[in-house]
Amino acid sequence: MLILNSGRWPASLKFVFVLPLFALAVGCNANDQEMVLKISWRDGFFSQGFPTDLRNDDNRIDVGGFPRPLQLFSLTYTRQVEQYDFGYSPAMPLYMQFGSGLAMAEHIDTLNPTEFASELAPVQVIDIDPDSPDYGARYPLAVAMTTEADQYRPQNLLQVRPVGKPLRENTTYAMVVLRDFAGNAAEVEPNPELTALLEGRNPWSVNPLLLWTDAARARQVYAPLAEFIAAQDLAVGDVIGATVWTTGNPSRYLKNLVANVSQWQPVPADAWLLREETADYCVLESKWEAPVLQKGAIPFVTAGTIDFDDQSSPVIRRTRTAPIIVTIPKQTMPAAGFPVLHYHHGTGGLATQVFERGLTAADGSQSYLGSPAQVAAQRGWATTAMAGHLGADHQEQLRLLDTVLELIPGFTLNHTTYNFLNPKAMRDNFAQMLAERTLYRKLVMSLSLDDSLCAAAVSGSGEFHFDTGHQAVMGQSLGSMTASASAATDQGYSGLIATGAGNYGLGLALFYSLGESDVGALIENVYLNVEPGTVTSDLFHPVWALAELVLAPANISLLTSKWLQAPEQAPPAPHVMVVEGHYDEQVTLPMQRPYLISLGADFMNEELDVPESSQLLPDLQIAGYEQLFSPVAGNRDGRTVGVVRYEEDGIMTGHHVTFQYPAPQHQYGCFLEDLAQGLTPTIIVGSVLGSACR
């Protein structure tokens, strides 16, 4: 009898015996058309699909193995993901890898996104959470597949983006690929480990060399999908790919921040003074000490984060002197006080823009005509504004930094808000803005102003004050983002007016143009080390997925979507009017579309005569929203929610149409007039500033 002494086997003989066993253990498949599913010993970032709950430990996401791990972006963002427990964002791309032998069927590229929202679709994203109100729902999708490997992605990587209504937080989803996805559908055999999981079995039963704990974990992760398949009596043998993941709750970050800050008592403002008057309103000015929550030195090359105490309340580091403005309409104040429009300026803006920012003429001069204060005053509304964090007023206070920034044409301190080099600071720059505006609003609503400051207005009591029951919030550009987040986290706004509006995220840097300079191309080339256009032209790119994992807590669409998805988790939803322009070089279409979809905005009136790729209407229709024609009121479950769109005027770009045209000014003026009268606001066909609404 021959007995082999394992301790004396030649190394080459050991290799011969061990290699097949190791290959089996890691799931090395004989069929190169299968989904790549490495339950044990991952082989590449996408070898279990992504996102997947195989990488989710109580909302702490394992991003180990992300491509190009030593590249600065990858290194910075993966480290930041690992520090937090926000979980998977509902707004990120999805990935599934197949073997090199599988070819996507030719007809997949011809399918409309809405055709994927079907139980017969070759690729499906399904809500499989039995506690979800959308259980069983399928979503419109954008689908693509890599044909060759690149710096970030392997060959045959299926890439999917849900493009309809947003996915929910704290909800379990599955991405399922059916046999018809493959060009050679009849020949494709599913991965046996995947089949076992979909049948509710432990994959160890088909591959006993998997690590037992990994196999048991995989069975647990796939159990909701196995139960869904059994309940729906679906054919497991037709499923050639599947991933399961549970979204996290990143929106809790800003909600918690506002909930705590709104309980603080703001320090009183300095004495109010009459600054100037127009025919429609008086301008009052003061100063206020705004709390600074971020630690470190501006512009936050490092640090820039907010710390929280044991009660989850943000820690105040210091204060900043902020100029503040109130405008009083030259009218008789209602008994409850003037209705008030809280205005948030945009990037590089000033508190005074609430009354100074009107029409820009061809020679570059700017008048007060059509300013928010004028539009509001004509309808009986007061306005208020503050100098925001990193805005132009703030920049002037930082003398040395201001001197340096003056040497860079078109660049301001406020542009450092989008500090993609330090994403925690980018997130918390937005959080700081939201926090200080929350507290400033509380200050304003407690004011009693001597009516002698505006003799042409009548108070009836000797003091001006503001009606807590009639408040709206308006913002331009970055201000539209803070305004939207304010309305979605702080109670009491009956209206939201967002202009030049969109999402907050990495796209604000990558899609940005500064004059004739393509800032995004420079970032791609220098920071991401890819050819310009590689990331910006490809919304499936893994850079977007990783960035969203870090910046999701500041993604305002996750907040505004609550008004439709989970109204019990948000303040009462306001009426919403959005004004967009073409071409907007600052808040571009990839940032506008998900924001508008999250609101449930219908498209008002005619779409612009631009290529379909530059339109908004098709994307809103994919999400289930409509094109309506003015007058429109109460179109979204009794609320008015709509977007109007204008072509640029030839003087300013489309980003500024609200200030360049009387039509949108007429529209949002009537929106405010209706709110003040307690009516459901109507979005009309705009014409002349200040003219009648009916």
How should each PLM-predicted stretch be described?
Residues D270-M333:
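Domain-level recognition of soluble alpha/beta enzyme cores
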Residues V26-G27:
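C-terminal motif of bacterial Sec signal peptides marking the signal peptidase cleavage site
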Residues I298-T321, M333-V458:
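Cap/lid segment of the alpha/beta-hydrolase catalytic domain
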Residues D32-I298:
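Acidic, low-complexity Ser/Thr/Gly/Pro-rich repeat segments typical of extracellular/periplasmic
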Residues Q159, H342, A425-Q432, S494-R694:
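C-terminal subdomain of alpha/beta-hydrolase-fold enzymes, centered on the catalytic histidine
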Residues M1-A11:
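N-terminal secretory signal peptides that target proteins for export/translocation
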Residues I108-N112, Y135-R138, N170-Y173, N184-R201, ...:
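Short, solvent-exposed loop/turn and secondary-structure capping segments
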Residues L449-F511:
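Primarily recognizes the serine-hydrolase "nucleophile elbow" in alpha/beta-hydrolase
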